[in-house]
Curated annotation (Swiss-Prot):
Protein's recorded name: Large ribosomal subunit protein uL4
GO molecular function, one term: structural constituent of ribosome
GO CC terms: ribonucleoprotein complex; ribosome
UniProt miscellaneous comment: A protein containing 11 mutations, chosen as amino acids which probably interact with nucleic acids (K140A, E141Q, Q144K, Q147A, S149E, K151delta, K152delta, I155M, P158G, W159E and K160L), gained the ability to regulate the E.coli S10 operon, suggesting it is now able to mediate contacts of L4 with the S10 mRNA leader in E.coli. This mutant protein did not associate any better with E.coli ribosomes however, indicating a separation of residues interacting with rRNA and mRNA.
Gene: rplD
An individual GO BP term: translation
Keywords linked to the UniProt accession: Ribonucleoprotein, Ribosomal protein, RNA-binding, rRNA-binding
SUPFAM superfamilies registered for this protein in UniProt: Ribosomal protein L4
UniProt cross-references to HAMAP family, sorted A to Z: Ribosomal_uL4_B (MF_01328_B)
Alphabetized InterPro entries for the sequence: Ribosomal_uL4, Ribosomal_uL4-like, Ribosomal_uL4_dom_sf
PANTHER family tied to this protein: 50S RIBOSOMAL PROTEIN L4, LARGE RIBOSOMAL SUBUNIT PROTEIN UL4M
Amino acid sequence: MAQVDLLNVKGEKVGTLEISDFVFNIDPNYDVMWRYVDMQLSNRRAGTASTKTRGEVSGGGRKPWPQKHTGRARHGSIRSPIWRHGGVVHGPKPRDWSKKLNKKMKKLALRSALSVKYRENKLLVLDDLKLERPKTKSLKEILQNLQLSDKKTLIVLPWKEEGYMNVKLSGRNLPDVKVIIADNPNNSKNGEKAVRIDGLNVFDMLKYDYLVLTRDMVSKIEEVLGNEAGKALTA
């Protein structure tokens, strides 16, 4: 199995953590990663852009001047696309831009992105990362200890509780830092708890240079992505 150094918030090595090769050390599939990012960005589009054609703009029923004997170019409507305030040719109309990707491809894309970070030595795992209260200075000091103060950093934390939420609030004023909180366990249809990693996504992992996880988050990721069947996954 692959191994990573386990660090504390002071940047000190406190141990070694074995991580799944199936999740963190596969040959990245860049095609599937692109498909995932394309799906993400497409699903963000509102699809509300709308223009009017020459048949929808107001006016234009009367011919502006006679066809002949004026010395001017012939025109049939003031709402022609070549006129100012005329209709728009082939303009956008409201549409649904959303795309879908099957669960296996989503998982493969996430494993590929995680493997890219691991192989580039840009994956850091902490024993834990909590703050007693939201304070940007405290998080900034932790990033300095990890030698990430001037790096674009994505921090992914396992669930919503006060200590983790304080980290998320502390990161709002740091322009190169994004903190993602994975959702709480949700009830599945059969009544069992489903572990979810909804916040983890390929786009953010590729956008930010370094990925910071906690030990609990690694376990959660391996539980969801460590096998091809069963676990809940949304994006």
